[in-house]
Amino acid sequence: MLKQISASILLLLLLTSLIHAQQREWVKVAPLGAGFSVMMPTRPTEAVESKELFTLHSFVAATGTTLLIAVYFDYAPSMKMNEATELVANRDSFLRGVNARLISSKEIKLDGRSGLEFTGEDERRLYKSRVYVFGNRVHQIASVSLKGDDETGNAERFFASFAFAAITDGQGKP
């Protein structure tokens, strides 16, 4: 009897902590100088990678079996970009990098910035992404989820929360 009560209490504590974890407040991610904000379920893992022609900043968080990704990269000022060409190249490179096939793609705009929304899939995963180009900066947000998982609400919340912000320095000056 004592074992059943202990097991019941343990199960109740586990369920309570899972419910609490799912209901906790999301974190607003607004990196200094990044020019965007987005909500994520946890503090993301941040990485910076510098190459000869660009610098990439990435922010990755997980919720259940879904990964939520926000990246921005700045091309060198010497790079001359065509927005439409860059959007398609980014889409194709993303899908090629994860060995996924394109399912849908459409042009979008947000705050006057040209963008592309696309979805893709491989044998096990679904990919959704939005990419925007403004000058020599590219912003991209993406979700990666397992097929059959019902985590669309988290991905929708993530995508809906993305907003552009003024790019400022450490003192809040443009």
Language-model segment annotations:
Residues 19-21:
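Boundary at the C-terminal end of the N-terminal hydrophobic targeting segment
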Residues 75-78, 124-125, 146-149:
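Solvent-exposed loop/turn segments at secondary-structure junctions
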Residues 30-59, 91-134:
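Signature of long, low-cysteine stretches enriched in small and polar/charged residues
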Residues 1-9:
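Bacterial N-terminal signal peptides that target proteins for export
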Residues 32, 42-45, 85-101, 139-174:
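Surface-exposed amphipathic alpha-helical segments
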Residues 26-27:
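Short helix/turn-capping signatures at newly exposed starts of structured segments
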Residues 58-86, 140-142:
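A short acidic-to-branched-hydrophobic micro-motif
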Residues 8-17:
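Bacterial N-terminal signal peptides
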